[in-house]
Amino acid sequence: MVATNRCCVFALLVALLLIHSLAEAGKGKEVLGKIKNKLVEVKEKIKAGWDKLTSKSEYACPVIDKFCEDHCAAKNAIGKCDDFKCQCLNS
């Protein structure tokens, strides 16, 4: 008898959760849309920050220099960052 009552209570809770989920589905689309818009804004801010950073050679060259050194080391060459372009010089 007790198990039957617990089962009914559980079924009732599941039904209420299902109804609530269906009712909130429309609102969920709005929330997901807002989240997507915020993520797009964050992506654009990060991209703008990176572009600003790389436009200043004194800040960007160390980052590019390290990439260039690693890239050229794989080719058994010496990497040199020149005007934001990686040049592999034969050693």
Curated annotation (Swiss-Prot):
Pfam families recorded: Scorpion_toxin_alpha-beta
User: Which InterPro entries would you find in this protein's record?
Assistant: Long_scorpion_toxin_alpha/beta
Q: In which tissues is it expressed?
A: Expressed by the venom gland.
Q: Can you name a GO cellular component term?
A: extracellular region
- Can you give the propeptide residue ranges? 26-44
Q: Which domain of life is it from?
A: Eukaryota
PROSITE patterns documented for this protein: BSPN_CSAB
Signal peptide range equals: 1-25
Which compartments is it annotated to reside in? Secreted
User: Is Metal-binding there in the keyword field?
Assistant: no
What pairs make up the disulfide bonds?
A: C61-C81, C68-C86, C72-C88
All residue ranges annotated as the BetaSPN-type CS-alpha/beta domain in the record? 58-91
Q: What does this protein do?
A: The full peptide presents antibacterial and cytotoxic activities. The synthetic C-terminus (AA 33-76) inhibits voltage-gated potassium channels Kv1.1/KCNA1, Kv1.2/KCNA2, and Kv1.3/KCNA3.
The family classification in the record reads: Belongs to the long chain scorpion toxin family. Class 2 subfamily.
Report the protein name in the record.
Potassium channel toxin TdiKIK
